[in-house]
Structure formats: C-alpha cells, structure tokens
C-alpha cells in the first residue's frame, strides 16, 4: 500500500503528514504570504511599471509572475526601502529611476534618492508641496501639542533642518512665510550646512519670479494659517 503524501503547491515538496505541510515554509510560500505587505506591494507595482516602461506592457503579469521572478528580492528590497525612508511620491520615484536608467541594485542607494528628491521638489506642483508640509506639521502638532503653524517658529531647530533636507517642508513654504524667514536668519553653521543644498536661494528666487501668482497664493495661504 502506497502511503498518502501531502504536497506543497508552491515548491512541490512532499510530506507524510498534513501537519508537517501546514508548518512548512518554503521561499515561494513565504512570498505569497507576504503579498499584502506594503513594501511588497510597492515592489510589485515597481516591477509592473518597469515592464510597462521598458517593454511596452505588463498587462499579462501577475503576482505569481512577480513572486517567481529572479528580480523579486531586488524589487521588494526597494519597496521596503521606500517604506523605511517614507519616500516622497513613490510612483514618481519609480518612474524617475527607470527613466534615468539607474541599475536596479542601486535603487536603494541614499545618493539615488537624494538626486531624485532634489529634482522632484523643484518641479512638483505648489499644491503638493503645501499639502505635504501642512500634513507633516499637523502630525508634529499631534505629537507635541504645539500648534502646527509654529513648527518653523518653535520646532526643534535640528528637527526643522531634517524636515527641510528630506523634502517634508518645501522651499515653497520656507521662503514664503514669516516663520520660515526667521528660521533661515537664525540657523547655525551646522544647520545651514544641512539645509542650504535643499533650498538653493538662487534657483528658488528665479522660480518665484517666473511664477508670481503661485508665490502670492502660497504667501496668502501661509499667512492666513498663521505661519
């Protein structure tokens, strides 16, 4: 009599006991269990975007294709990296690394994200910059109990420098409100070293001259909000 066996549908390994199969965890089974994880989903969408942009279509690609792809680990590593650094506008970041022909194994490099972010904050819509900055300061307010509009005015100076250097607070906000101007005037040498590359006054003053209506709108919104 042939003993009954239980086969893993992912790796096809056979077991004598169903209970052993139940606790078995092969690489493919693990990947399917991780499918709903945010970082894995970002990896999947990046994988699909890569095929769409480089080969014209990804319509027939499924999660099963992704999970069995030799590039699975690299894309998931990137997805988890985006979650870890709270990357700004992940879809745009993905498009950018593909258009720039960045090697997949370089997508998680800090220098690559910084290069993207420098370009992105210069080109993004004012409304996106305002929304992100206001949302960031509201979360700060929830943590500290201070009014959101006082982040640049009374927030920890190093925390403010970090927020600017990571794109949470855009130069649109820093240059166009009273508290931002005050912060710039009072920065110490270390903070200036961190912040200056991200606010590039020459570039932004030219941008404000080119888009006076946007600047006026930004100033008015921030003034009304008490910034």
Range-by-range predicted roles:
Residues 63-227:
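Intrinsically disordered, low-complexity regulatory/activation regions of eukaryotic proteins
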Residues 1-44:
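C-terminal recognition-helix end and immediately following basic linker
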Residues 5, 9, 46, 112-115, ...:
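Intrinsically disordered, low-complexity N-terminal regions enriched in serine/proline/glycine
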Residues 33-77:
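Charged, amphipathic alpha-helical linkers/stalks
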């Amino acid at each position: 009599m042939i003993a009954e066996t239980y086969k893993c549908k992912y790796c096809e390994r056979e077991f004598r006991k169903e209970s052993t199969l139940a606790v078995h965890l092969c690489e493919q089974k693990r990947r399917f269990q991780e499918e709903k994880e945010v970082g894995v989903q970002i990896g999947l969408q990046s994988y699909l975007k890569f095929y769409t942009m480089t080969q014209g279509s990804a319509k027939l690609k499924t999660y099963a294709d992704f999970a069995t792809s030799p590039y699975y680990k690299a894309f998931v590593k990137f997805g988890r990296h985006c979650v870890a650094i709270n990357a700004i506008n992940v879809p745009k970041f993905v498009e950018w690394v593909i258009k720039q022909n960045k090697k997949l194994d370089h997508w998680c490099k800090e220098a690559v994200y910084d290069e993207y972010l420098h370009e992105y904050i210069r080109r993004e819509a004012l409304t996106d910059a305002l929304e992100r900055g206001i949302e960031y300061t509201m979360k700060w307010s929830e943590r500290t109990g201070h009014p959101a509009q006082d982040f640049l005015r009374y927030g920890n100076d190093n925390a403010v420098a970090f927020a600017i250097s990571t794109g949470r607070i855009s130069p649109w906000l820093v240059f166009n409100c009273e508290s931002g101007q005050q912060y710039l005037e009072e920065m110490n040498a270390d903070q200036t070293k961190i912040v200056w590359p991200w606010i590039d006054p020459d570039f932004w003053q030219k941008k404000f001259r080119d888009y006076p209506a946007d600047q006026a709108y930004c100033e008015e919104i921030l003034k009304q909000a008490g910034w």
